[in-house]
Regions:
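Extracytosolic ligand-binding ectodomains
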Residues: 1-236
Length: 236
């Protein structure tokens, strides 16, 4: 959910738009949680939320109704706190509808460029906040990217791969903090890990100094990137 707050802050601070619309998945906790935080922060930052359009897991193919309302609203930017599969359809349908608004998303959009047969030109200038950018120049990222590309298909490298890599070491750090041993029951291990997660700080590929709340929400700084010529480029 904190991605919603960060996205509203970034859009407002960079002057990307004043009239903003949102398309979100009301049946998904990730999407609706980000939307709720975005809505609150957008109001605090003076952004005009001119349209909020929802869909559900059962209605994620045809977005013509949502896009028609958004086009009529005069939105300058459309915020997409959703996953890349639905985003690819929205981008295609938005083009067909003659929508020229900017698009901005969160880490769920990472993977958009890897969709089979997706026209990458539809994603040109799409902006998003993500915890991982493969072309970052810090040593941690460079080492991870080199190791990943040596073993796997480089075209599959995205923030989900980086998240999975970090997750292994995060659980390891929590297990060590909790003193987990092999003779403990599964329920005891789970309870021990939940307690330890709020006490550890982890440096990883997707963030430095990562910490966790009791709710499981992670605290880490996302990176802003824009898709240009089929590649992620860092933004200020």
């Amino acid at each position: 959910p904190n991605q919603g707050t960060a996205s509203a802050d970034y859009i407002a601070s960079k002057g990307l738009a004043t009239k903003v619309a949102v398309i979100y998945n009301s049946s998904d906790a990730y999407s609706s949680g980000i939307y709720d935080n975005f809505k609150a922060e957008a109001a605090a930052k003076g952004l005009d939320l001119v349209a909020s359009e929802a869909f559900t897991g059962d209605s994620k193919q045809d977005f013509s109704s949502q896009l028609s309302k958004i086009k009529a609203s005069g939105a300058e930017l459309i915020f997409l706190p959703i996953y890349y599969q639905e985003a690819s359809l929205i981008l295609s349908q938005a083009k067909n509808a003659g929508i020229t608004a900017k698009f901005f998303g969160c880490d769920g959009l990472d993977g958009l460029l890897n969709i089979e047969n997706f026209d990458k030109s539809l994603a040109e200038n799409v902006m998003l906040l993500t915890p991982f950018a493969a072309n970052a120049t810090d040593e941690t990222t460079k080492k991870f990217v080199a190791a990943y590309n040596a073993k796997y298909d480089p075209s599959t490298l995205n923030q989900f791969a980086a998240d999975a890599y970090d997750a292994v070491y995060i659980v390891k750090a929590a297990a060590e903090k909790a003193g987990v041993t092999g003779d403990m029951s599964v329920s005891d291990i789970c309870n021990a890990l939940k307690g330890a997660m709020t006490e550890i700080t982890v440096d990883g590929v997707t963030g430095s100094g990562m910490t966790w709340k009791a709710t499981g929400e992670v605290n880490k700084e996302p990176k802003a990137v824009k898709i240009e010529n089929g590649e992620y480029q860092p933004m200020d």
